[in-house]
């Protein structure tokens, strides 16, 4: 059981869908495939040479189409375990081009979260931190 499994994945910002893949199977736990590393995924063009990848979505859950404009907070799919993934999770990656791994990586800013218990109004979580959205704390 994984908390994130089949949870809705929301667009983190307004943008245009420039790539989407759906129909790849979710992997059995602990098994990974290297030939489609992102699995089912969506790439949003945020403008200003900023592209965000939302990867490892659940098979059959991608809810947006290529060229579609999406609003911040709009559901784009559901959390899964497709692609090169050993367990359900969402992979978020920002870079300067729409092709995975082809561009320069960009820092991703988040708002209203706690990192290791400390409230952050805006910042960049780092490896090893436990991160909780403020909205989840209030529930």
Give the residues covered by each predicted segment:
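Acidic, glycine-rich catalytic/binding loops that coordinate metals and/or anionic ligands
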Residues: 36, 63, 68, 93-139
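Short glycine/proline-centered loop/turn elements that form peptide/ligand docking sites
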Residues: 63-65, 81-88
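Short, small/polar residue-rich loop motifs at catalytic or cofactor-binding pockets
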Residues: 3-5, 62-63
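Histidine-centered catalytic micro-motifs
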Residues: 57, 87-97
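Short histidine-centered loop motifs in beta-beta connectors
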Residues: 10, 50-73
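Zn2+-dependent peptidoglycan hydrolase active-site motif and core
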Residues: 14-58
């Amino acid at each position: 059981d994984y908390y994130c499994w089949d949870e809705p994945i929301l667009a983190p910002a307004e943008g245009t869908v420039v790539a989407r893949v759906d129909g790849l199977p979710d992997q059995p736990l602990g098994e990974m495939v290297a030939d489609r590393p992102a699995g089912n995924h969506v790439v949003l063009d945020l403008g200003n040479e900023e592209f965000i990848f939302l990867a490892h979505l659940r098979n059959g859950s991608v809810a947006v189409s290529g060229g579609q404009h999406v609003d911040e907070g709009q559901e784009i799919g559901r959390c899964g375990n497709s692609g090169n993934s050993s367990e359900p999770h969402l992979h978020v990656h920002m870079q300067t081009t729409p092709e995975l791994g082809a561009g320069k990586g960009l820092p991703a800013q988040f708002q209203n979260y706690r990192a290791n218990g400390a409230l952050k109004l805006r910042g960049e979580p780092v490896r090893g931190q436990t991160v909780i959205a403020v909205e989840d704390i209030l529930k």
